[in-house]
Design a protein with these regions (language model features):
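Conserved small/polar residues in nucleotide/adenosyl-binding loops
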Residues: 2-12, 284-291
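A short glycine/serine-rich beta->alpha loop
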Residues: 169-174, 206-214
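Glycine-rich, flexible beta-strand/loop modules in the N-terminal catalytic cores of phosphate-handling
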Residues: 114-200, 286
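Extended amphipathic alpha-helical scaffolds
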Residues: 14-148
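Alpha-helical support elements that line or immediately flank enzyme active sites
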Residues: 128-130, 219-231
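Phosphate-handling active-site elements
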Residues: 195-198, 229-240
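A structural-propensity feature for long, helix-poor, extended segments
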Residues: 149-170, 175-178, 182, 238-283
């Protein structure tokens, strides 16, 4: 019988207090700052990998340290990046707090589609393709809201593994693909022409070619350009950007970063997306702050 059997007691996975001090003797805060201070995502990952190998070799005989080494390096990285931002006002890629990464845009890069556009912001790149069809191709919706039975404009977002240097198999849309696609779709709906003005079904597909932060807002920019390339008479041009919040020990100690990259997203306290035209804001996301 299993009744009254002794409970299994698991060992704690907490990082020993002395471990951070021992790590800093091998990798100083200045060395960690130098490792993360680069505008190239791959170079930064190589630097952290080299630090990990160095610490694995140094702690080869300490099983307790090796068991939590990955988390300890992550926390060390996080503290370093947050200190750089809050105290020194220095971002990992050298930008100012309100500075946007270099932009590039191109339309009509695919000849045999109705509309196409490529939008690049730093190391984030999206290719969007728009297809037009008759109203008979409108999407029928059988949902909980009886007032919404069809959808004329559809935006689909794809995030293949190769965009972040991975080789895993894609098994259909996940939470990220559905959420990002809906976000970019809602950003463009207010500027679309009415059915009377433009009697077509519209489908936009955003393919992520490279990802280092805010692919949803890059999809908004790319889909806006591809809609115009397809001849859709939108009411205004729409752009989107992701901002990040980093907080200190007091309520007055905080910074809002413009155009966050992946590292700032991971180590920050909150990120929020903003889309709009030259006249004002169209869409704003307000996620819950992280612990």
């Amino acid at each position: 019988s299993l009744v009254g059997s002794e409970m299994c007691i698991r060992d704690s996975c907490a990082i020993p207090e002395q471990m951070f001090e021992d790590i800093k003797k091998i990798v100083t805060p200045e060395q960690m700052e130098e490792a993360v201070f680069t505008d190239e995502k791959q170079k930064r990952e190589e630097n952290i990998r080299a630090i990990t190998e160095q610490l694995e070799e140094a702690f080869a005989d300490n099983e307790e340290y090796l068991a939590v080494l990955g988390e300890a390096i992550y926390q060390y990285q996080k503290k370093t990046v947050r200190k750089m931002i809050l105290k020194d006002h220095k971002r990992p890629d050298g930008r100012a707090i309100n500075q946007i990464r270099p932009l590039a845009a191109e339309v009509d890069l695919i000849p045999r589609v109705h509309g196409s556009a490529m939008f690049t912001r730093g190391q984030t790149q999206i290719c969007d393709v728009v297809t037009l069809a008759p109203l008979s191709e409108i999407q029928k919706i059988d949902g909980l809201d009886a007032n919404i039975t069809t959808k004329r404009y559809m935006h689909h977002y794809n995030f293949p593994a190769y965009s972040v240097g991975e080789t895993k198999v894609s098994r259909g849309p996940g939470r990220r693909e559905i959420g990002h696609g809906a976000l970019a779709e809602k950003a463009l709906v207010p500027v679309l022409p009415s059915i009377e003005e433009f009697p077509y079904t519209i489908r936009a597909v955003s393919e992520t070619f490279e990802s280092n932060g805010s692919t949803s807002m890059a999809s908004t920019c790319a889909s806006c350009m591809s809609l115009m390339a397809a001849g859709v008479p939108i009411k205004a041009m729409v752009a989107g950007i992701s901002c990040g919040l980093v907080t200190g020990d007091t309520d007055d100690d905080f910074l809002v970063l413009t155009d966050i990259q992946g590292l700032e997203d991971f180590f920050g306290d909150m990120d929020f997306k903003v889309t709009g035209t030259h006249k004002g804001c169209l869409l704003y996301t307000s996620p819950s702050p992280r612990d």
